[in-house]
A protein has these predicted regions:
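Non-catalytic structural scaffold of enzyme domains
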Residues: 1-126
Length: 126
């Protein structure tokens, strides 16, 4: 499942990549997408300096919706601010279900460091 801004979802960047890997990408319905946007841009959202309380509550409701209603097993935090609210984890309980939370920025950082390390070994540089 993907939790991101309306704009990020509309670009289809995550959906196309998932499809190329034969994975289904689900997104929140209109009501729950509004909650994601509220968690980001709302008066008590992360862009207003909040990382707990209301923004976390509504984001967790949207996450639970993706797991319960859409069958998501992993949730991508597709907005750079969302990992400030929810941490990356292999297993979070959401209602009666569970899912992994994926932080794309952290995943990218891990991959970049790994690739840089491999290049360094190949070139014999430290």
């Amino acid at each position: 499942g993907l939790m991101a801004t309306d704009g990020t979802i509309e670009t289809g960047i995550y959906g196309r990549k998932a499809k190329s890997m034969k994975l289904a990408m689900v997104v929140p319905d209109k009501e729950h997408q509004a909650m994601v946007m509220e968690a980001i841009y709302g008066e008590k959202g992360v862009k207003a300096g909040f990382t707990d309380g209301h923004c976390k509550e509504v984001l967790l409701k949207a996450a639970e919706h993706l797991v319960r209603d859409k069958g998501a097993q992993a949730l991508i935090l597709g907005c750079t601010e969302l990992p400030l609210i929810l941490e990356e984890t292999d297993n979070i309980k959401l209602g009666d279900g569970h899912a992994a939370i994926v932080d794309p920025t952290a995943s990218l950082a891990r991959r970049v460091v790994k690739v840089a390390g491999e290049i360094t070994k190949i070139r014999g540089v430290r």
